[in-house]
């Protein structure tokens, strides 16, 4: 029999979710799923994880109630359990950007590199693709 009160039980559940979120690969998988439903194979490819590794991380996220899954033939599709998960990811990013100097430096460096890119029209892009550039 547990001697934990309701408040402690509630915070223990919050901590379990936070622990599940405490892995970079899982956050990256959630970021991919924020863009829409994906299969394990697509998620593995986009995050450069093995299918087995991606599957294990996705199972952790699903057990924590952060994802829903459905099977279609031999494929398993994953999606975020609700929009609140996207809110959590956004809040984590904002907190990190405001309070962690290294995150701020990386973000600044990334966006400064975008300024070096040269815009192209659709027509120019198609020409570059045809030429293999």
Name every feature range the model reports, one short phrase each:
Residues 1-12, 87-131:
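Amphipathic alpha-helical dimerization/coiled-coil segments
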Residues 9-53, 76-84:
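N-terminal helix-turn-helix DNA-binding core of bacterial DNA-binding proteins
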Residues 17, 74-76, 89-94:
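Short, structured secondary-structure boundary patches
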Residues 58-59:
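Short, hydrophobic-biased segments on the C-terminal half of alpha helices
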Residues 62-72, 79:
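Beta-hairpin "wing" of winged helix-turn-helix
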């Amino acid at each position: 029999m547990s001697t934990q009160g309701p408040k402690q039980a509630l915070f223990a559940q919050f901590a379990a979710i936070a622990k599940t979120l405490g892995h970079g690969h899982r956050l990256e998988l959630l970021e991919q799923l924020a863009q829409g439903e994906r299969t394990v194979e697509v998620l593995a490819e986009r995050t450069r994880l093995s299918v087995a590794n991606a599957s294990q991380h996705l199972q952790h996220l699903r057990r924590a109630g952060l994802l829903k899954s459905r099977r279609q033939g031999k494929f398993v599709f994953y999606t975020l359990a609700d929009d609140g998960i996207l809110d959590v990811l956004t809040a984590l990013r904002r907190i990190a950007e405001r309070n962690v100097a290294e995150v701020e430096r990386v973000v600044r460096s990334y966006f400064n590199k975008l300024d070096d890119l040269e815009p192209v029209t659709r027509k120019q892009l198609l020409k570059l693709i045809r030429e293999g550039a």
